[in-house]
Amino acid sequence: MEVKTLGELCNIVSGGTPSRSKVEFWKEGTIPWIKIGNIKEKYVNEADEYITQAGLDGSSAKMFAKGTVLYTIFATLGEVGILGIDACTNQAIAGLTIKDTNQLNTDYLYYYLKSKKNYVNKISRGVAQNNINMSMLRSFELPLPEISKQEEIVAILDKVFAIINDRQHELQKLDELIKSRFIEMFGDLKKNDKGWKILRFSDFAKIDTKMIHDFEEYQDYPHIGIDSIEKGTGKICGYRTVKEDAVASGKYIFTPEHIIYSKIRPNLNKVALPDFIGVCSADAYPILPIKGKCNRTYLAYVMRDKVFLDYILAFSNRTNLPKVNKKQVEGFSCPIPELNLQKRFEDFVKQ
């Protein structure tokens, strides 16, 4: 099978941001200006900000035609979408315009880029700003079967992802039900309208950082990086073993008794409940609830709640790279209901 680079197959350029200080670049703008947060589905049809023609002409922003494939290259890496409208983007997004559509199918390119997400996050590690440059993107190699075969692959993947999307919508409804039950049982934790006893974090949990550097006996253990934890839901997915990831730097041990909390970019709200033993990135904290004081499931949902998120973001927003430390987490206080009520909530979640 023929293999070509993205640079051979596509014209690839990044977007730009018109100066915010120039009102005429933004006021009454009509040109959609796409940001990472707008890439939520396969097709990108909406923007929440618009620029003027003067803003487009007076900046590095570029107009991309409907059908252009968008790929995020800065901060949140590897998000992919296909423009359903003519639009421009900020500099965190690259636009890929296929040179010859008889050689490369747009949807095939979309699915190929989706498959590269773990790879781009891996090669970007160690880069201070968490990004990939245009040269790296242009060098990605793409297997290139005949166009008819590409269309067959796309048809199969469309069906697969339709099933996945349906399942995700079901899980989203379930997650909303759980959050609703949480509020029903425990009230608004910020107001503590049910009058629960307030305890400091260190009174009901501890940050249990047992770091290992020698991985000889841990080769078959799951290795959970922060990219393996889904934002908001805490679902653990896409991980490999210590051996497969060729882990060399220090990691933390965790068990099914721990919560894994990502301390990097806490706005992503990555709070996981593992049901196996493994090692996790040093960019996360294994948190161990104290028996007799706090239930693991209850604490995980507290940490996903606005009461914890607002508290922790007040610290992380003061730095260029949002990150929280041990002292800040341990300084958190929250209502701790009776254990039997926490257990009832856990039983509801497990149903």
Map each language-model feature to its residues.
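Periplasmic-binding protein-like
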Residues: 120, 308-311
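Short coil/turn segments at secondary-structure boundaries
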Residues: 19-26, 126, 197, 214-222, ...
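A short beta-sheet element
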Residues: 35-36, 46, 50-114, 250-252, ...
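Non-catalytic DNA-recognition/assembly elements of restriction-modification systems
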Residues: 1-17, 41, 139-155, 170-212, ...
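Contiguous mid-protein beta-loop-alpha structural module that forms a pocket-lining wall or clamp
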Residues: 165-166
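A short glycine-rich beta-alpha junction/loop motif
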Residues: 2, 73, 87-94, 113, ...
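Sequence-specific dsDNA recognition surfaces
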Residues: 7-22, 37-66, 202-213, 226-256
